């Protein structure tokens, strides 16, 4: 007898980036919530297109004094831009997380796939 069943696709990624929720609690919670709402955990680096995507992502979300607008997926990823999850968080949490993520991925070439995990 022959049995056939569809196998679940396993997402392809090149690197795993683990974000420590005890160091960046607001950013980590935003990403967790965005993932729970269907935003991708595997994203593709595209640094050249980031400037245009951040404008699209933040369009219509006004700045508030004492907060930064955090987006997931971030604009440095092809999946970012229009439709990204936006949350206002503390500037120190946002800027430290963005700086750390940018530094960790600085030598990684465009089109690399990164899987984000919150720990």
Annotate each PLM feature.
Residues 1-69, 73-119:
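Nuclease and nuclease-like effector domains acting on nucleic acids or nucleotide cofactors
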């Amino acid at each position: 007898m022959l049995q056939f069943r569809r196998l679940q696709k396993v997402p392809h990624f090149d690197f795993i980036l683990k974000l420590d929720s005890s160091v960046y609690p607001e950013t980590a919670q935003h990403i967790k919530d965005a993932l729970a709402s269907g935003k991708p955990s595997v994203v593709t680096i595209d640094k050249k297109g980031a400037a245009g995507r951040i404008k699209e992502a933040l369009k219509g979300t006004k700045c508030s004094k004492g907060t930064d607008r955090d987006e997931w997926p971030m604009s440095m990823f092809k999946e970012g831009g229009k439709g990204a999850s936006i949350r206002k968080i503390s500037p120190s949490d946002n800027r430290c997380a963005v700086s750390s993520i940018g530094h960790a991925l600085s030598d990684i070439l465009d089109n690399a796939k990164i899987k984000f995990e919150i720990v």
